[in-house]
């Protein structure tokens, strides 16, 4: 009986693939499971022509390695579930 129980536990762990699936935000309220091998979440921000009125452009996603920031970008990476939430933007004052 103990052998059967142990076998069921092992099969469950293998089938669930525990610890291998990271969840990252892909948009403001859009968490998704990352593809296998992509074990980092990233947040990339930069200014475009509308930065003064709309704020920075934000890109969220999964990556195997942290993206290298270009000179005009800010990039942060993390490795826990939902660790890259959409940045909160201050509201403009009228």
UniProtKB/Swiss-Prot annotation:
Disulfide bonds: 24-41, 34-62, 47-51, 66-77, 78-83
Keywords of this entry: Acetylcholine receptor inhibiting toxin, Disulfide bond, Ion channel impairing toxin, Neurotoxin, Postsynaptic neurotoxin, Secreted, Signal, Toxin
Claim: Amino-acid biosynthesis is one of the keywords in the record: no
GO MF, one annotated term: toxin activity
Compartments it resides in: Secreted
GO cellular component terms attached to this protein's record: extracellular region
Tissue note: Expressed by the venom gland.
Pfam families found in the cross-reference section: Toxin_cobra-type
Chief localization: secreted
Signal peptide from the UniProt entry: 1-21
Superkingdom field: Eukaryota
Family: Belongs to the three-finger toxin family. Long-chain subfamily. Type II alpha-neurotoxin sub-subfamily.
Protein purpose: Binds with high affinity to muscular (alpha-1/CHRNA1) and neuronal (alpha-7/CHRNA7) nicotinic acetylcholine receptor (nAChR) and inhibits acetylcholine from binding to the receptor, thereby impairing neuromuscular and neuronal transmission.
Name of protein: Alpha-elapitoxin-Nss2a
Organism: Notechis scutatus scutatus
Lineage summary: Eukaryota, Metazoa, Chordata, Craniata, Vertebrata
